[in-house]
């Protein structure tokens, strides 16, 4: 099963167009990153990148890029909405002013 971490890693590689540059950005080894991408490719049964310099997306990679971008966006949105349900005051804005100034405004 493809997980969100692998999708995130894929998107960073696609943006960087390099496994080594993406690995540096993610603070992981290039071997670890390659293993995550290989896991996705094995699971879906096709390559996502043309291993040229710079890396380019295959047609399947382009489709996966669109889907992964959308899924990660929806996941982040859902997490924010759920957090707002759990803690509605989390994103509230508080303004502090002195009593004298508040009276003058009212």
Regions found by a protein language model. Give the residues of each.
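N-terminal winged-helix
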Residues: 30-31, 80, 86-106
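Residues within the DNA-recognition helix of helix-turn-helix
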Residues: 29, 36
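Base-recognition residues in the alpha-helical recognition helix of bacterial helix-turn-helix
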Residues: 8, 35
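Alpha-helical linker/hinge and terminal dimerization helices associated
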Residues: 43-44, 64-86
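A short LG(V/I)-centered, amphipathic sequence patch enriched
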Residues: 41-60
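The N-cap/first-turn positions of alpha helices
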Residues: 3-6, 30, 61, 68
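Residue cluster at the C-terminal edge of the helix-turn-helix DNA-binding motif
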Residues: 16, 25, 38-47
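Short helix-boundary/capping micro-motifs
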Residues: 11-27
């Amino acid at each position: 099963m493809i997980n969100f971490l692998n999708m995130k890693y894929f998107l960073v590689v696609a943006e960087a167009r390099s496994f080594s540059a993406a690995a540096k950005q993610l603070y992981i080894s290039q071997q670890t990153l390659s293993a995550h991408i290989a896991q996705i490719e094995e699971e879906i049964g096709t390559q996502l990148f043309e291993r040229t310099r710079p890396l380019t997306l295959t047609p399947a990679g382009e489709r996966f890029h669109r889907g992964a971008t959308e899924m990660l966006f929806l996941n982040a949105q859902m997490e924010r909405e759920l957090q707002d349900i759990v803690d509605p005051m989390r994103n509230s804005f508080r303004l502090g002013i002195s009593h004298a100034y508040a009276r003058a405004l009212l």
